Amino acid sequence: MHSVSLIKRKRAEPPAQLMNKCIIIGKIEKAFQLFKDEGTQEHLMYNGSRLYATTIDVTRVSGIVDKITVAIPEKLYTETISERIIVRGSLRTFNDSRHKLILYVLAESISPANDVHDTNLLTLSGNLCKKTVFRKTPLGREITELLIANNQYDNDGHSIPSYIPSICWNANAKAAEAYSVGDWLLVKGRIQSRVYEKTNDSGESVEYTVNELSIGRIIKYNRPIV
């Protein structure tokens, strides 16, 4: 089986990592399995290590469940992982062979959650890489959609950019509507999953789940935040 590495380009002396920290506490939906490109079935790797992935169910106070893909390096993998876990890591994305953007948490550590409440927190900095889209939902809520670029580096100095689909609401949405491509942003929020229906080539209605960053706080800066 061939492997595909999440590596794009290399710099001799990589700059400091941009801010990208998250903590996820929830229930494992299924056992960890090798993380693969669903189109090619190639293994995904990071720092020379194969990745294993699963879905974590995180329940909001409202009762809505967010399903979050979590990937761990092989060195963290064990078949005896607790049913509920604490994951600390960073939010990453990649485009698979089907041109589908995959959003996942790359774990730096995992531990049993025991009686700890479900948690879904993310702090991230990056620059706006696409013009914002402001609109109103059918229920009249104002939202702005953003695409935030966050660059990280592996142990060999290879650049690994992630492009984070994000959404902000109401007053934040009005402020973000005026942002320009290239603006540096610091955001805090949570990773949410959203189900929508799409008609396939056969005319059938199929449900899809997408993940995005739901922003609770957003600040514009004139420099990168590390």
Language model feature labels by segment:
Residues H2-V226:
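Single-stranded nucleic acid-binding surfaces, predominantly the OB-fold ssDNA-binding core
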